[in-house]
């Protein structure tokens, strides 16, 4: 068996600026309880690529796709989308967020309010999600 050693340059580009990482961690803290209890994903730190949104399942146990979190807005959008998806699952309707009925929309907006009150700079993401732009 031939082993290949992979060299990593010490001067590789920083994953996030200090400001970007701080803002991602602020969003992570606001959504901490939601992130902790979700059975559908895990937010992990990698020294190689930064934060990774990992799609998982717990029954049955599986690991699916991993997506690198590019920014605080990226993380916030994914979390808001997951909150909305929880409402759609709760109502038993199998449709996209853009097709949510008025009662579903009211509940989604009510749940989003908890987070957006703490992260007002990201309120525009709610409209983007509802308009199918994300």
Regions found by a protein language model. Give the residues of each.
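Short, Lys/Arg-enriched N-terminal segments with co-localized hydrophobic residues
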Residues: 1-13
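Positively charged, low-complexity intrinsically disordered regions
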Residues: 4-6, 23, 27, 35-37, ...
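Intrinsically disordered, low-complexity peptide-like regions
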Residues: 9-11, 32, 38, 57, ...
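Intrinsic disorder/low-complexity segments
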Residues: 11-13, 29, 74
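Negatively charged, low-complexity tracts enriched in Asp/Glu with abundant Ser/Thr
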Residues: 15-45
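Acidic, low-complexity, intrinsically disordered interaction modules
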Residues: 45-124
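Short acidic DE-rich linear segments
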Residues: 129-134
